[in-house]
Regions:
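Extracytosolic ligand-binding ectodomains
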Residues: 2-22, 26, 30-454
């Protein structure tokens, strides 16, 4: 899931080095730093890992960018965290504990993320961590592991496909899969000439190499490949090169205000006509829509935009519980465009599911200790033969109290964890309506992706 910080180094060179460095310092204590790590719920610090109920507060830490070029990611995740924990608290909490959410600002930079995480642990270990985007995951996931804290992360980095981190879980696909999905979308639309325009941050750049490979395998032509400096205020040079290449479609991810500026200039240099755009799932976001629609026009964007996204529920009991929990937070969130976009935003959907999975696992294990409840995450997510399917914490807790085995299926659909704790489903094609509502235009089959070599 694209996320982020600029680097000109190969990420495959950078990530192992960062992981090694993080492992080296993970046990060195919680020394330095005064990065942002403020409680979003105004509640108590995190609770210790107790083995039974006791009324103390369990903290869910949202470790993600709240400032910087990717500063919209953390707040999106926090809305989902508040929704999930409020619903859990309304059902009585976990083993007598209520939950709260705490923001930890990584600023989208490993150099800021590691000290911010140490500061977080210095103030009390969280019971669960969410967020951890591609900006900082490689540097902070080893620290989470050293502190034996379960995390549900949004990183799409391919390294997590084949490196085992026992406390790490992921409900979103690697960026490689998304690149193939975007290419399949372009091929299905009959586009022949493709341009790439991705931000110079870590998360966005992870899409580029697999996209180039997928475009070649699909028999399409790559006519331009431009990197957008997210600290820049104009992209006229990059836009001019792409306009001159005459692509049928532009595949892109550039978060923050950059995308709006780039697409505005590209439209101007293309004779006032917007070139069709295929975005990553990160572009399904209230903030992204609000800025880009204001720049190019809501109707123009609706006619020329699509994005890949994981298939999510849009009706039924899981969707109803999720929608109710999310809309309960609406009045607490500032103006971010169409609030209903949160119901399909990957970070909102899959982190909500992650929090519910962890809470139900604690309930099943009768313990908030990670060593005790971790095995139940996969047991409850993947289910066992004869397990009762539940769609919320409240219904899951009731079934567990009745002595039943359960399988949790939330708005993100059923899970299927592999040996690396990854679980990713099928892709759908999303579009925006002129009012900013997300609509599903269709699905991508496994056969379509495999035809490109995925």
């Amino acid at each position: 899931m694209g996320a982020h910080r600029s680097t000109l180094r190969s990420r495959r060179t950078l990530v192992p080095a960062v992981m090694a460095a993080a492992l080296a310092v993970a046990t060195a204590g919680c020394g330095s730093s005064s990065n942002s790590a403020s409680s979003a719920a105004g509640g108590a610090a995190s609770a210790s890992h107790s083995s039974s109920g006791g009324g103390s507060t369990l903290t869910v830490a949202d470790v993600a960018p709240f400032t910087g070029t990717d500063g919209a990611l953390g707040p999106t995740y926090l809305v989902s965290c508040d929704a999930a924990t409020s619903a859990i608290n309304s059902a009585g909490g976990v083993l007598g504990h209520h939950l709260n959410c705490k923001s930890v600002d990584t600023r989208g930079d490993p150099a800021d993320a590691v000290p911010a995480v140490h500061q977080m642990y210095a103030s009390g270990s969280p019971s669960l961590i969410i967020g951890c985007t591609s900006d900082e995951a490689a540097s902070v996931v080893p620290v989470f592991g050293a502190n034996k804290t379960v995390s549900f992360c949004m990183t799409g980095q391919a390294e997590f496909d084949h490196v085992k981190f026992p406390y790490f879980y992921r409900l979103v696909p690697p960026d490689l899969s998304e690149s193939y999905a975007m290419t399949a979308m372009a091929k299905n639309k009959g586009y022949k000439r493709v341009a790439l325009a991705f931000g110079n941050d870590i998360g966005s750049q992870t899409f580029v190499a697999p996209a180039i490979a997928a475009i070649k395998k699909a028999g399409l032509t790559l006519v331009a490949n431009e990197t957008l400096d997210l600290n820049s205020t104009t992209f006229r040079t990059e836009a001019a090169k792409i306009a001159a290449a005459k692509p049928d479609v532009v595949m892109t991810e550039a978060l923050g205000p950059s995308e709006a500026s780039f697409l505005t200039e590209l439209k101007q240099l293309n004779g006032g006509k917007m070139i069709p755009v295929i975005g990553t799932s990160a572009t399904i976001s209230p903030d992204w829509y609000k800025s880009v629609a204001a720049a190019v026009g809501a109707s123009t964007l609706a006619s020329n935009f699509s994005a890949d996204n994981l298939v999510t529920q849009t009706s039924g009991p899981a969707y109803q519980a999720f929608s109710k929990a999310m809309f309960a937070e609406k009045g607490k969130v500032g103006s971010t465009g169409n609030f209903s976009t949160y119901l399909t935003a990957p970070g909102a959907v899959h982190l909500y599911d992650g929090i519910n999975l962890a809470a139900l696992a604690m309930t099943a294990a009768h313990s908030t200790s990670p060593s005790a409840f971790m095995p139940y995450i996969i047991k409850i997510g993947d289910g066992a033969p004869g397990a009762v399917v539940v769609h919320s914490f409240a219904t899951g807790e009731a079934a567990l109290k009745a002595g039943k085995q359960i399988r949790y299926e939330g708005p993100g659909g059923p899970t299927n964890f592999d040996a690396y704790h990854d679980s990713a489903g099928l892709f759908q094609v999303d579009r925006y309506s002129p009012t900013g509502a997300v609509t599903v235009a269709g699905n991508l089959s496994v056969a379509q992706l495999r035809a490109l070599g995925l």
